[in-house]
């Protein structure tokens, strides 16, 4: 048996080699004896067969080809082995939903189906999209239009009619050429037309005759006259006195500064120490619409002037019974701004009816009216004693206009702003004034010189529709529309003080008035939510904030002789006194 196995091994080795190898092998290994191979001889009664079957290339179980038997998660992005096609596209593991439609049962990676990345020419896509939006047809995207003749989706009839034109193509317009008069014979000197010939259907436009021109002039004159009559007429001025007697037993009017209120109202010195107001002590109600602005009587502050969107101006007592003394009626639209002269005997009012009016504070008489047919947004008297006949007004047509009360004429115009002028404030002992505008700039002007010598406009700046000078005359507080109060120096360079920026209130869109306490320890301002905000001047910390009005708190004034009295006004039509 062992001899037979050896012989088989020898024959197995020789089967795969060349002839030379087999010759060398036979020379080295001796042939087995004939007796040992007797069992391999043919049997006469049976077919020849081998007792041992040998497979030269047996199947081997390779580790990489083994399937794990685990279903693939459709969300998996990476597989560590080579799965078969059946594994990759096997249905999702789990019970099938019998109520799913064919579209819902199909594999999806978004709500409406399966989206695959594809390269599309941006121009071609936009061309077909716009064509479909304009004409109602587009090329069928499911067909290869290079191989198949163009097929359209949408309005096929329109596509055939336009011969498949897209929005970026223009078809030839079937229009007849305009015919010209022909006379090309150059020898005809008078009648030769050549290329300058007129069109057959061309109409000559002639200048009107003298008679027609006269008629036209008469018609235009009538229209202009009619238009002038339709222009807004100034409202009739009248006044209402709300107290029984205008003068007291000594013959003094309400302009007389009282001396029995516990405070020296004639003093020029501010109080030594100011305190935070905490409670409401009085409400002045009389306006039927929102109050636009409040102004205290110059120096003493014993009277309060208010203007409102109900077209009225009212004068109130700050001390005593706090009555409404007089109402001034004369504007046909909302009053925007008011300003006392230095003595307080007269005041100006600016309204949306395009009129500026000068009133007598004591009698209520309207002394004069001014207009340049533009809306005045702010008005200011020149504070100098020798210039009480001059005032400036910021207009909606980007100009600052200077009027003389005595003549009623415009004597100067400052027209460098690029937007409507919002505020005017006198600085530097009234030799200069600062103006702000909707063009987001701040300009400084010398009095009576219509060229600004200082222009401040940073890219980060916003419009500043409310500006106030500090009591010591050194700083300008500007209400910026990005919800912060900016402080500029009011002497020499007018630089922004970056250490003094007051934040924490919401004023975007509202020209809320800013004011200082008399001792320069606090800064106050209303906001769009009807709250009164009080900051510390030194630290810029927000000390106090409380609800003052139901609507926008547009004005806030600290009484110049009181330690903690603040007057606020709002769009709820009320004026409130806080202490």
Swiss-Prot record:
Q: Where does the record place the modification Phosphoserine?
A: 46
Q: What is the effect of changing residue 502 to C?
A: In PCH15; in knockdown cells, unable to rescue higher intron retention levels and to restore normal cell viability, contrary to wild-type; reduced protein levels in homozygous patient's fibroblasts compared to heterozygous or wild-type cells
Pfam families under this entry? WD40 (PF00400)
Q: Which UniProt keywords apply?
A: Disease variant, Intellectual disability, mRNA processing, mRNA splicing, Nucleus, Phosphoprotein, Repeat, Spliceosome, WD repeat
For this UniProt entry, what is the primary localization, expressed as one broad class? nucleus
Q: Which SMART domains match?
A: WD40
Q: Where in the cell is it found?
A: Nucleus; Nucleus speckle
Q: Does the keyword Ion transport apply?
A: no
Q: Which Gene3D superfamilies match?
A: YVTN repeat-like/Quinoprotein amine dehydrogenase
Q: What biological-process terms (Gene Ontology) are attached?
A: embryonic brain development; mRNA splicing, via spliceosome
Q: Entry's InterPro entries?
A: PRPF17 (IPR032847), WD40/YVTN_repeat-like_dom_sf (IPR015943), WD40_repeat_CS (IPR019775), WD40_repeat_dom_sf (IPR036322), WD40_rpt (IPR001680)
WD repeat boundaries on the chain: 286-326, 330-369, 371-413, 416-455, 459-498, 504-545, 548-578
Top-rank taxon: Eukaryota
Any one GO cellular component localisation term in the record: U2-type catalytic step 2 spliceosome
**What is the associated disease?**
Pontocerebellar hypoplasia 15: A form of pontocerebellar hypoplasia, a disorder characterized by structural defects of the pons and cerebellum, evident upon brain imaging. PCH15 is a severe autosomal recessive form characterized by progressive microcephaly, and poor or absent psychomotor development with severely impaired intellectual development apparent from birth. Other features may include spastic quadriplegia, early-onset seizures, and chronic anemia and thrombocytopenia.
Instruction: Give the record's subunit note.
Output: Component of the pre-catalytic and catalytic spliceosome complexes. Component of the postcatalytic spliceosome P complex. Interacts with PPIL1; this interaction leads to CDC40 isomerization.
Record's protein name: Pre-mRNA-processing factor 17
Give the source species.
Homo sapiens
């Amino acid at each position: 048996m062992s001899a037979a196995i050896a012989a088989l091994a020898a024959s197995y080795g020789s089967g795969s080699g060349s002839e030379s190898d087999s010759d060398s092998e036979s020379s080295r290994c001796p042939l087995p004896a004939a007796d040992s191979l007797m069992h391999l001889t043919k049997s006469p009664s049976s077919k020849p067969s081998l007792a041992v079957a040998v497979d030269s290339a047996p199947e081997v179980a390779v580790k990489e080809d083994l399937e794990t038997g685990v279903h693939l998660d459709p969300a998996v992005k990476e597989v560590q082995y080579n799965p078969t096609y059946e594994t990759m596209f096997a249905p999702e593991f789990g019970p099938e939903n019998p109520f799913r439609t064919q579209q819902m049962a199909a594999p999806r990676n978004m709500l409406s189906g399966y989206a695959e990345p594809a390269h599309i020419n941006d121009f071609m896509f936009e061309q077909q999209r716009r064509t479909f939006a304009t004409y109602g047809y587009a090329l069928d995207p499911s067909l290869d239009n290079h191989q198949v003749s163009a097929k359209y989706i949408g309005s096929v009839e329109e596509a055939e009619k336009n011969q498949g034109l897209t929005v970026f193509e223009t078809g030839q317009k079937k229009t007849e050429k305009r015919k010209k008069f022909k006379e090309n014979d150059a020898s005809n000197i008078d009648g030769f037309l050549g290329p300058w010939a007129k069109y057959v259907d061309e109409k000559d436009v002639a200048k009107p005759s003298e008679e027609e021109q006269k008629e036209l002039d008469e018609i235009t004159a009538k229209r202009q006259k009619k238009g002038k009559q339709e222009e807004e007429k100034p409202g009739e001025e009248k006044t209402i006195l709300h107290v029984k007697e205008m003068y007291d037993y000594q013959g003094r009017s309400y302009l007389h500064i009282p001396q029995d209120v516990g405070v020296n109202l004639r003093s020029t010195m501010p109080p030594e120490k100011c305190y935070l107001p905490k409670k409401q002590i009085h409400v002045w109600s009389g306006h039927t619409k929102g109050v636009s602005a409040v102004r205290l009587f110059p120096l003493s502050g014993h009277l309060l002037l208010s203007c409102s969107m109900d077209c009225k101006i009212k004068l109130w007592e700050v001390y005593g019974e706090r009555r409404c003394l007089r109402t001034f009626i004369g504007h046909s639209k909302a009053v925007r701004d008011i300003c006392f002269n230095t003595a307080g005997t007269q005041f100006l009012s600016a309204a949306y009816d395009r009129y500026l009016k000068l009133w007598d504070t004591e009698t209520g008489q309207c002394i004069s009216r001014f207009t340049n047919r533009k809306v005045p947004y702010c008005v200011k008297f020149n504070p100098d004693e020798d210039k009480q006949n001059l005032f400036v007004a910021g207009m909606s047509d980007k100009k600052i206009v200077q009027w003389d009360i005595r003549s009623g004429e415009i004597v100067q115009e400052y027209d460098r702003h690029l937007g409507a002028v919002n505020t005017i404030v006198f600085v530097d002992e009234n030799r200069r004034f600062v103006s702000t505008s909707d063009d987001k700039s701040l300009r400084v002007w010398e009095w009576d010189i219509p060229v600004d010598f200082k222009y401040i406009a940073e890219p980060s700046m916003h419009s500043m529709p409310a500006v106030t000078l500090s009591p010591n005359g050194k700083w300008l507080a500007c209400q910026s529309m990005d919800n912060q109060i900016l402080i500029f120096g009011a002497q020499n360079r007018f630089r922004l003080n970056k250490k003094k920026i007051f934040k924490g209130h919401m004023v975007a869109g509202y020209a809320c008035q800013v004011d200082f306490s008399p001792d320069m320890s606090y800064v106050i301002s209303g906001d769009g939510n009807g709250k009164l905000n009080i900051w510390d001047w030194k630290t810029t910390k927000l000390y106090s904030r409380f609800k003052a009005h139901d609507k926008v708190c547009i004005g806030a004034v600290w009484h110049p002789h009181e330690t903690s009295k603040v007057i606020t006004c709002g769009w709820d039509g009320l004026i409130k006194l806080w202490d």
